[in-house]
Swiss-Prot record:
Entry similarity comment: Belongs to the protein kinase superfamily. BUD32 family.
Protein name, per record: EKC/KEOPS complex subunit BUD32
Gene3D superfamilies tied to this protein: Phosphorylase Kinase, domain 1, Transferase(Phosphotransferase) domain 1
Note: Present with 3020 molecules/cell in log phase SD medium.
SUPFAM superfamilies: Protein kinase-like (PK-like)
Catalytic activity: L-seryl-[protein] + ATP = O-phospho-L-seryl-[protein] + ADP + H(+); L-threonyl-[protein] + ATP = O-phospho-L-threonyl-[protein] + ADP + H(+)
Organism ancestry: Eukaryota, Fungi, Dikarya, Ascomycota, Saccharomycotina
Domain Protein kinase stretches: 16-261
GO biological process assignments: cellular bud site selection; maintenance of translational fidelity; positive regulation of transcription by RNA polymerase II; telomere maintenance; telomere maintenance via recombination; tRNA threonylcarbamoyladenosine metabolic process; tRNA threonylcarbamoyladenosine modification
InterPro entries associated with the record: Bud32 (IPR022495), Kinase-like_dom_sf (IPR011009), Prot_kinase_dom (IPR000719), Tyr_kinase_AS (IPR008266)
Subunit structure, interactors included: Component of the EKC/KEOPS complex composed of at least BUD32, CGI121, GON7, KAE1 and PCC1; the whole complex dimerizes.
Keyword annotations from UniProtKB, A to Z: Activator, ATP-binding, Chromosome, Cytoplasm, Hydrolase, Kinase, Nucleotide-binding, Nucleus, Phosphoprotein, Serine/threonine-protein kinase, Telomere, Transcription, Transcription regulation, Transferase, tRNA processing
Name of the gene: BUD32
Length: 261
């Protein structure tokens, strides 16, 4: 990402808004800022926010590109606003949305992990605990991750890109609270296929980065997930059976694709 591009983004926001890039994906670029879109900046404030920006795609017709950017930015913003209201579900708070220019302003979550282990997403957290992978802290955190996914799915929402990098951990004393982030591919869906795919994507992400301990890690995640459904009584047990059955089918299809190359 060039300084010229950053300056161009800054010109959309006005020079008063400081930005620092932290990640770049296929659809969006994520910046941090210390500037709130509406509130005056407090002196000596260390408060940070996230700005997610969908840049124009030159390969698309400008009118089509503008329409897609507006639709996707609004869709993600509306989804986050609804998810934030679900009791027990942890997602970043939506602060502002500019769909015409492709900007979303969000609450900043997480921190740097001790010992130079990077930002506090689930992937880095598990790497940090690689010397003690089966500790109570790791098990508890992964079950909490499963509960977050369970709450998301029980309320008929799907993430669409559920990797260990899209789960941010927020410190709560000696413990950590998982938050689901980046709902650019999120959707409202009661389809067991979509839920099964979500679970499979996370399972594969854990397997690819923490292969030695992946079986136990994924089992703990599923314990938390299943707990949410079982708390809903007979209806929850029935739906859980449907989701886990489809998850197994999705997993089987994935294995067949791997074997065939």
């Amino acid at each position: 990402m060039t300084q010229e591009f950053i300056d161009k983004v800054s010109s959309y926001l006005t020079p008063d808004v400081d930005i620092a890039p932290i990640s770049q994906g296929a659809e969006a670029i994520v910046f941090t800022t210390t500037t709130h879109p509406y509130l005056p900046r407090a002196k000596d404030s260390h408060q940070k926010y996230i700005i997610k920006y969908r840049p124009p795609k030159r390969y698309r017709h400008p009118q089509i590109d503008q329409a897609l950017t507006k639709h996707r930015t609004l869709n993600e913003s509306r989804l986050l606003a609804k998810l934030y209201l679900i009791p027990g579900l942890c997602v970043p708070q939506l602060i502002a949305c500019d769909p015409y220019n492709g900007f979303i302003w969000l609450e900043f979550l997480g921190e740097d992990l001790p010992g130079g282990h990077g930002f506090s997403n689930l992937k880095n957290f598990l790497w940090m605990h690689d010397q003690d992978p089966y500790s109570d802290l790791v098990a508890t955190t992964l079950r909490k991750v499963g509960r977050q996914i369970g709450l998301l799915h029980w309320n008929d929402y799907c993430h669409g890109d559920l990797t260990s990098s899209n789960i941010v951990l927020v410190r709560d004393g000696a413990r950590w609270t998982p938050h689901l982030i980046d709902f650019g591919l999120g959707s409202v869906s009661n389809l067991v296929e979509d839920k099964g795919v979500d679970l499979y994507v996370l399972e594969r992400a854990i397997l690819s980065t923490h292969s030695k301990h992946a079986e136990k890690y994924n089992a703990w995640i599923m314990e938390g997930f299943e707990e949410v459904y079982r708390e809903q009584g007979a209806k929850g047990a029935k739906k859980l059976k449907e989701v886990t059955k489809r998850f197994e089918e999705v997993r089987l299809r994935g294995r067949k694709r791997s074997m065939l190359g």
